[in-house]
Amino acid sequence: MSQPVQTFTPQAFHRQAHDALENPQIRANFRKAMDGLMGKRRKAFDDWDLETLRELGANIRLRALSKLPDLLEQLEANCEANGIRVHWAENGEQACAMITEICQQHGASSVIKGKSMVSEEMHLNAHLEQAGIEALESDLGEYLVQLNEQTPSHIIMPAIHLNTGEISDIMHERTGTERTTDVDAMTAAARAQLRERFMTADVGVSGVNFAVAETGTLCLVENEGNGRLTTTAPPVHIAVTGIEKVVEHLADVPPLYALLTRSATGQHVTTYFNMISSPRKADEHDGPEEVHL
């Protein structure tokens, strides 16, 4: 039977770290996943001069940093002109309060979440739950660790510490699915469980990979399609990001995207690349009625 990990605290970190390092199953799970990921990453840069691309990406980021106050104002102005409502928070606690307030204004009882590391850092789920709002992760790895009452163990692969058998046990124990080691079958079962939740959620919460000041566009990189559903199916979409994600021009995105996909998952392109510039317009049949940043 799968067991939830303890909540990590600064006081207990050393003991918990030693416990994890001494667990041969966790070490084997990490090694298998990381060996595969690093191999894919090396191959993904075969058609690129990595150092040149890295230098280009660094220059784009440094240029944005040198103009950051102006770019943030430009981003806000263009987002607002597009119909995206912009909110500023000084810290995670303020951001959680703002997001909770937006949900409450819409009478929301359920939130579906795309992958967002900043929301993890803010402990957004706990804040929403304290307000009586259910928050469900839709990224497959995040969904699995949430089912097992854990937190993500890796920024790209949240469930990297779990192997196929452990995942099968979690899904069987928490959702009643049949035990299987067939990855496709487990993925299909999770997809079926999540699909209805996308359609019935009151609010969708996502992260942001790039926020383009020039156009007021929010870019979201993903592979599972959950990001697109999170940002289009619920009537309200809330995008959560730190100020470091802003870039000046739309033309700055492709080189950063090339670096991101190859470095993160060893892919030339991800399955989905979403560009969000407004809520649903009068002549459109789908998309959220409100978008908040």
Give the role of each language-model region.
Residues 1-293:
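The feature marks the mature, well-folded catalytic cores of soluble enzymes
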